[in-house]
Amino acid sequence: RIDMMEKHPMGSQAFIPMKETTFLAFVAPKGDKPEIEKIQSFIIPPGIGINYKVGIWHFPLISTEDMNFLVVDRKGSGDNLVIEDLNKYELILDFKPAV
């Protein structure tokens, strides 16, 4: 259930998996609030890391098994986390395999 999204307005955020497993990423474009109709989901194959650009809305990563990630995040002053509650929506995302 995608019940919230977060963004980091002051820095990008990278996730490098510490073992070979598949995980899911859910993202929405930059903006004041996530645009529900523009949320996209991606299946990230084993051995691949991801980097969210500054301001990209995303849901915490979902792994197909227990997983640890090396996280590269911004350090410094200022609030670099914005959370938007999505509980008022019922989100159903279709899976369409890449061609």
Tell what function each PLM region has.
Residues 43-57:
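Conserved metal-binding segment of the jelly-roll/cupin
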Residues 13, 50, 67:
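Residue-level detector of short, conserved catalytic/binding motifs and their immediate flanks
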Residues 1-41, 73-87, 91-99:
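Non-catalytic, conserved peripheral segments adjacent to functional cores
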Residues 54-70:
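Ligand-binding loop in jelly-roll beta-barrel domains
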Residues 46, 61, 65, 87-90:
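Solvent-exposed, flexible loop/coil residues
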